[in-house]
């Protein structure tokens, strides 16, 4: 906690940068070309920070993509040099294992070279509940249908005090970790995430990182576990959470950054860019058993994302051909010129860009 709270950013950056070069010795920074496709916006979880979802009782707002909708999206992605769909959606009350197996198989039949980085622990837990299966059985069947890797979606902060208020219908912290543990025991490659800057404390951020580190220590020998960690600040614009705060209707003990309970905390004196950089740096230091740290530039902008390459990050993520969920809550940093813009930012930061696949191998 002292490092996070008190150490000057320049000193913290130097420590994290040294750790980065221990994991990735070369002065190179990876990136990926993929497409984020949200297959449905129907969701039971009703997260207080999400502007994208609609409730099952809102048919006028609901959508689910038809299979034919995927084909032009895949074609456009391939034309831009991409090879992977980041496929995510809501916790749809009617979609069990059969629906996902059918979708995955049809996608792989239509485009055999396509990589599916799909769903996340909340969806896996939801499918298990709907289909009355174990987490392991769901993962085994989805892998057989075409699932390649499992994103770290839905982690937010792995502390149940936070989760019960923000997203009470989502899996608990332990359930999220249990899904990932099963994926790791199956030898799957996954990622881990953290969304900060809402009702959590700095201590809870550290506890989140420690929980990830402990799970990574438990992965079977020779398996990747978490290949990468990604963090970003929550986008509050227009969310139910911000509306509750503005109306003075947050429960006792629940505060947002900048409110009275935070004023004694050094983080409320950090500029948003410094808070992001400090969080990336502390993640690099805590997660010494995770190979890669990604600079999630979508919510902080490309300039700040590139600065993160000097505080422990070694990957710039995707060019983001399509993104809906975070953008619906206020993020507006999608690239207009795609790969060239991202490569230029990496080079300007003093690194050599290289295009990777989902397993951090050159393409």
Where does each model-flagged region fall?
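Flexible, acidic/Gly-rich N-terminal and inter-domain linker regions that tether
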Residues: 1-46, 354-363
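Active-site cofactor/substrate anionic-group-binding motifs, chiefly glycine-
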Residues: 22-79
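Glycine-rich, proline-tolerant flexible connector loops at the mouths of alpha/beta enzymes
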Residues: 4-5, 31-37, 58, 86-98, ...
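Hydrophobic faces of well-ordered beta-strands that scaffold small-molecule active sites
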Residues: 29-35, 85, 116-120, 150-152, ...
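Auxiliary Fe-S-binding modules of radical SAM enzymes
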Residues: 1-10, 78, 210, 217-363
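Conserved Radical SAM active-site core
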Residues: 54-214
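Mobile, glycine- and charge-enriched loop segments
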Residues: 28-29, 44, 50-54, 59, ...
């Amino acid at each position: 906690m002292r490092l996070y709270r008190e150490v000057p950013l320049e000193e913290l950056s130097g420590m994290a940068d040294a750790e980065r070069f221990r994991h990735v010795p070369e002065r190179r920074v990876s990136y990926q070309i993929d497409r984020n496709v949200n297959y449905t916006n129907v969701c039971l979880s009703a997260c207080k920070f999400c502007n994208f979802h609609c409730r099952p009782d809102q048919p006028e707002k609901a959508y689910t993509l038809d299979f034919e909708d995927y084909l032009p999206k895949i074609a456009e992605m391939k034309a831009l040099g991409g090879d992977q769909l980041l496929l995510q959606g809501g916790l749809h009350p009617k979609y069990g294992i059969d629906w996902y197996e059918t979708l995955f198989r049809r996608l792989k039949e239509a485009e055999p070279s396509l990589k599916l980085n799909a769903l996340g622990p909340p969806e896996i837990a939801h499918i298990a509940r709907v289909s009355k299966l174990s987490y392991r059985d769901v993962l085994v069947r989805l892998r057989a249908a075409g699932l390649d890797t499992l994103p770290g979606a839905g982690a937010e902060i792995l502390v149940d005090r936070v989760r019960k208020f923000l997203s009470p219908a989502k899996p608990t912290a332990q359930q999220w970790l249990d899904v990932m543990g099963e994926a790791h025991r199956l030898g799957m490659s996954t990622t881990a995430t953290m969304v900060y800057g809402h009702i959590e404390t700095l201590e809870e951020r550290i506890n989140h990182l420690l929980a990830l580190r402990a799970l990574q220590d438990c992965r079977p020998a020779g398996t990747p576990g978490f290949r990468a960690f990604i963090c970003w600040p929550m986008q509050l614009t227009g969310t139910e959470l911000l509306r509750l705060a503005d109306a003075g209707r947050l429960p006792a003990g629940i505060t947002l950054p900048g409110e009275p309970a935070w004023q004694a905390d050094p983080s409320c004196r950090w500029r948003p860019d410094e808070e992001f950089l400090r969080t990336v740096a502390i993640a690099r230091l805590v997660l010494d058993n995770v190979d890669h740290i990604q600079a999630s530039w979508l919510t902080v902008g490309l300039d700040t994302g590139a600065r993160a390459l000097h505080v422990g990050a070694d990957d710039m993520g995707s060019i983001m051909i399509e993104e809906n969920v975070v953008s619906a809550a206020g993020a507006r940093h999608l690239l207009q010129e795609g790969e060239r813009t991202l490569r230029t930012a990496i080079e300007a930061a003093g690194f050599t860009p290289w295009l990777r696949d989902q397993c951090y191998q050159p393409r």
